[in-house]
Amino acid sequence: MSTLGMTLLILLLLLPLATPDDVGQPPKRDTLRNLLKIGTRGQGGCVPPGGGRCKANQACTKGGNPGTCGFQYDLCLCLRN
């Protein structure tokens, strides 16, 4: 059997394993991008990159410590709990 034929056979055998049972459902794990939103500190709190403010369940942090960021344009992370 040729290499291409063998590769196709292996892919066909693995296809059922690659298909999740809950197709169309959102992933169960949050990605790192969803967990950490890097923003800058504006007037009155952490401002996410797209503008606006962190939600009530997010905390403005600097250097891994919860709290305010000190200066207006310090880098901060909006962490989802």
From Swiss-Prot:
Transmembrane segments: none annotated. The keyword GTP-binding does not apply. Disulfide bonds join 46-69, 54-76, 60-78. Expressed by the venom duct. GO terms for molecular function: toxin activity. It is found in: Secreted. Residues 1-20 form the signal peptide. It comes from the Eukaryota. Keywords: Disulfide bond, Neurotoxin, Secreted, Signal, Toxin. Coiled coil: none annotated. Residues 21-40 form a propeptide. One of its GO terms (cellular component) is extracellular region. The cysteine framework is IX (C-C-C-C-C-C). This is Conotoxin Cl9.6.
